[in-house]
A protein has these predicted regions:
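A generic structural motif
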Residues: 36-42
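A short, GP-enriched loop/loop-strand-helix hinge that lies immediately N-terminal to
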Residues: 6, 15-19, 58-99, 114-123
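Glycine- and acidic-residue-enriched helix-capping/strand-helix junction motifs
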Residues: 16-29, 33
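Hydrophobic residues within alpha-helices
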Residues: 26-30, 76, 104
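Conserved dinucleotide-binding and phosphotransfer motif residues
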Residues: 37, 83, 111
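Eukaryote-biased intrinsically disordered, low-complexity acidic regions enriched in Ser/Thr/Pro
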Residues: 42-56
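Hydrophobic alpha-helical packing residues
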Residues: 34-35, 80, 108
Length: 156
């Protein structure tokens, strides 16, 4: 952020996702770096306050250090855009597409980008979930990666 017209920076960190600890660490590192570069830094943690309490009159730009659900999936970005506040991060649609593994997978396949075989288990199927049958039916084999559809930071 070399543009000094963005002097007052709000670092949004923490949140309520399973990646809260990662977000807090990222946010703290950002705060330290911004202060060192002489930016006026304030913080906001959506775990304790709703995003609608952001006072846009007191900030020039939002540094989005949220990780996971609501931070990387387009939710926070859409609210920042609603407030008409510039922010760091990809936009709403890009964030959603990147965070949702099924959407990403579909985009890769449609654009002929090589990607490993996969199988998605939906909540309704969990009762009857039989890994051995799925492996045989889908011709999958170990090693496997099992992850939630919309979390990052290697949670899963």
């Amino acid at each position: 952020m070399k543009n000094k017209k963005f002097k007052r920076v709000l670092v949004v960190l923490g949140g309520t996702s399973g990646e809260r600890a990662v977000s807090l660490n990222s946010g703290k590192a950002c705060i330290k770096a911004l202060i060192k570069k002489k930016y006026l830094v304030s913080t906001f943690d959506p775990k304790f306050k709703n995003l609608n309490l952001i006072d846009k009159r007191k900030i020039d730009v939002i540094f989005n250090a949220l990780h996971g659900k609501d931070g990387e999936d387009g939710v926070a970005q859409s609210y920042f855009e609603y407030l008409n506040i510039p922010y760091t991060h990809s936009g709403v649609i890009s964030s959603y597409n990147a965070m949702n593994k099924l959407v990403s997978k579909d985009l890769f396949i449609k654009n002929k980008i090589l990607t490993p075989k996969f199988y998605s288990v939906h909540r309704a199927e969990k009762k009857n979930y039989n890994l051995k049958k799925i492996l045989i039916k889908k011709k999958l084999h170990f090693p496997l990666v099992i992850k939630p559809i919309n979390q990052g930071s290697s949670l899963g």
